[in-house]
Amino acid sequence: DALEREWQRGYDLVILGGNCLYELATAEEQETIIRKAAGALKRGGFLFVDNAHMEGELAPDWQVTGQRRKLGLSGACADGSQVESFAEITWVDAANRLVRLRRRVEITLPGGETIAQEYEQQKHPVSAGEVRGWLEQNGFEIQQHYGDYTGSPYTDNSPRAIFWARKG
C-alpha cells in the first residue's frame, strides 16, 4: 500500500484529497504520507491536502461508541445493485485523537444475493496544526490555506482545512 511501497518521483502535483489522511491509523502514518509526497514531487511541485477541520480535542460525535451509523458511501449502482456502508465506533482514545471502528459494506445484487464484508479500522482525525507542521518539516512552503471548497480563507470555524503547498 501507500505506506510500504516506494513512490515514483518527478511529479508536478500530488493530491491527498477527500480526507484520505483519515484512512490512516496514526499521526506517524499520516506524516509518512506527507514525507512520501515530498519525495514524489520535483522541486517546485505542488501538494494539495484536504481534510475535515477538527482542532483541539476529539470532536464529541467521534466519541460515541456502540452506535451503528449508515455512511454516505451508500446508494444504487447502474446495474441495479444496492450498496450500503456502515460504521460503529468501538474504542476511543480522546487524548490522542484515536478511534477504532467496525466497518461493514453490504452489496445486494439485482438477483437478490447479498455480499457483505466487515473489517476493523483505526483512524486519527488530523488537525490543521499537525498538517501544517508536517508540511513545514518536509520542505513545503504553504502557499494557501483554505477553509472550504469555494476558496474561502481558513478560520477557526471553517468546515475544511485545505492546504496548497509548494515543495521548496
Regions found by a protein language model. Name each.
Residues R9-Y11, A59-V64, N157:
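Short aromatic-enriched loop/helix-cap "lid" or pocket-rim segments at secondary-structure transitions
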